[in-house]
Swiss-Prot record:
Keyword Transmembrane helix among UniProt keywords: yes
Active site, UniProt feature: E581, D646 (proton donor)
Keywords of this entry: Biomineralization, Cell membrane, Disulfide bond, Glycoprotein, Hydrolase, Membrane, Metal-binding, Metalloprotease, Protease, Signal-anchor, Transmembrane, Transmembrane helix, Zinc
Function comment: Peptidase that cleaves SIBLING (small integrin-binding ligand, N-linked glycoprotein)-derived ASARM peptides, thus regulating their biological activity. Cleaves ASARM peptides between Ser and Glu or Asp residues. Regulates osteogenic cell differentiation and bone mineralization through the cleavage of the MEPE-derived ASARM peptide. Promotes dentin mineralization and renal phosphate reabsorption by cleaving DMP1- and MEPE-derived ASARM peptides. Inhibits the cleavage of MEPE by CTSB/cathepsin B thus preventing MEPE degradation.
Topology Extracellular: residue spans: 38-749
Family that this chain belongs to: Belongs to the peptidase M13 family.
Any one Pfam family match given in the protein's UniProt record, by short name: Peptidase_M13
Intervals, Cytoplasmic compartment: 1-20
Molecular function per GO: metal ion binding; metalloendopeptidase activity
Organism of derivation: Mus musculus (Mouse)
Protein name: Phosphate-regulating neutral endopeptidase PHEX
Amino acid sequence: MEAETGSTMETGKGTNRGIRIALALFIGGTLVLGTLLFLVSQGLLSFQAKQEYCLKPECIEAAAAIMSKVNLSVDPCENFFRFACDGWISNNPIPEDMPSYGVYPWLRHNVDLKLKALLEKSVSRRRDTEAVQKAKILYSSCMNEKAIEKADAKPLLHILRHSPFRWPVLEANIGPEGVWSERKFSLLQTLATFRGQYSNSVFIRLYVSPDDKASNEHILKLDQATLSLAVREDFLDNTTEAKSYRDALYKFMVDTAVLLGANSSRAEHDMKSVLRLEIKIAEIMIPHENRTSEAMYNKMNISELSAMIPQFDWLGYIKKVIDTRLYPHLKDIGPSENVVVRVPQYFKDLFRILGAERKKTIANYLVWRMVYSRIPNLSRRFQYRWLEFSRVIQGTTTLLPQWDKCVNFIESALPYVVGKMFVNVHFQEDKKEMMEELIEGVRWAFIDMLEKENEWMDAGTKRKAQEKARAVLAKVGYPEFIMNDTYVNEDLKAIKFSESDYFGNVLQTRKYLAQSDFFWLRKAVPKTEWFTNPTTVNAFYSASTNQIRFPAGELQKPFFWGTEYPRSLSYGAIGVIVGHEFTHGFDNNGRKYDKNGNLDPWWSVESEEKFKEKTKCMINQYSNYYWKKAGLNVKGKRTLGENIADNGGLREAFRAYRKWINDRRQGVEEPLLPGITFTNNQLFFLSYAHVRCNSYRPEAAREQVQIGAHSPPQFRVNGAISNFEEFQKAFNCPRNSTMNRGADSCRLW
């Protein structure tokens, strides 16, 4: 996975941020382009003798894009990230409604603008498929702010008046039918209804995915769920920041309950108990560093699970979650059904805690989590109260524009419908051909380095690594099935949206989402298919299918440059991303899966020990990076997989680029860009850095370090290039420079 993101919530306020950003980019780009065009037309550029220059409009555009991002006053050998990105960051301040901002969010915003234009078109019964009509109606209902304001909290209060959603803190304040009864409270019924009807996983996460050791089969899995705060440590630590986050959460819970009709003193009392319970849950959660693939693979049948943790009716829970009206073939789920219990100790501790807790506190917590998830769908008074909470935990000061919130919601609710709408207009099929070139170049580079430069892996393990590399399956653009209108229409046939009932529409999508993964239970894993949303601005590796995936949303400038632009730009940007995803198959987790996607020990003991020894170098390197904005050091162990992928991907893409020069241009360098003095190798590294230009608010920086899988962007860039001798050659970095680690350089692949 490539992108870094800050925490966001679906809230909205109409602003002209998109227009301001577009206008600033247009003016800035026009000025730079105009200057370069004038210099070229007047012959005022000082070209090197006998050096070929590209003067096509695309090359002038590329030169302008590069110059708008760099800061030439910074020494690239001391801080390459600042050299490459300072210009972009200074010209693109973080929007007030975002916790961080960078080239990834910038491209995401541009995709959202395109989706907005598509969804705002009037419904055509003749031209639009049934699924597209539903997407447009859903968007229209989300944009119907007048109806949302008129409804206010009524749709949510309607739910809270019915079992199992009655919220004890509200007492009788929303009517006698809303009074919670301890005698009637059922933990199983509440958890199952939340998961089966609203896709809310509280305490327990139940889902279907491939069996790690039999990857052709789907299996039920049980895991720990999330918390109200993104960072588990914020419930446990006594730092100033953690305390302020807990205080903000507590006040938010109290105020939300009061907005829904609770008595203030009752809300303050009850929510203190709720917070104490959530702290207890945070204490027993399995931390990231202990969540290894081997540790989380605990396969057993439901009968064995019930014997291990008898305090909960696991079979009853699973049967209540799954809607057998949709999946009648699952009616026979019984004690012999296999499940993978990813966190047995967590579940043992969970039911010990719940067994000693007051039912009222448990009910208050469960319903709070449901209410919290629905706040984005309520009126402005709830949105503004959430914004006060967000100011503390994210640093944002305004709400997202309503259209942006709505686009994000529709995209997540109906990904394949929106995906088809997008690719029909904005995806060029010839991109697949160039992506195949990049992918095969990276595959060759990985295998070539494995054969010629890897001296620590024994022959048998190396042979199996080559087999896995050759077996990696690439998916580009979009899944073919989204073009089948009959299939997509049939998939959504039970959904009936109303333009005047946004909240009701949301509940329908939640039910659809809640039941969707159970479709796969008892079915074989389609190893050649993929199910990624085409509008996603990110890329992925799937260990269970040994696939690398590049959705259409990612394949745009400045990630993917077409054939009219220098190849150095594409190889440095999307090429490194291809290498990054490819290398995930051989990182500290991906390496445990064989070429068929099975969790299988295919490494020799000797090679595995040498791999682990070499990872220590990278763990130490990144752990020594201190991020002043976050006030924390990078977690080198937590980010190890992504750091391995960054370093390997950079080497593979550069090697593939040089092979392309040798094969396609007989070793002759590409024409240079006009008006700038960068060589093609330098452009490669600049393009690598440019897609990672990003800035953060302190709150988002702290969260990125605490729970992010990636190192912060500046350390992703500087960390990888400082380990790579080809970068040091390209920029003539002396041995004692910061970007030249020399003998201290780390390398696995």
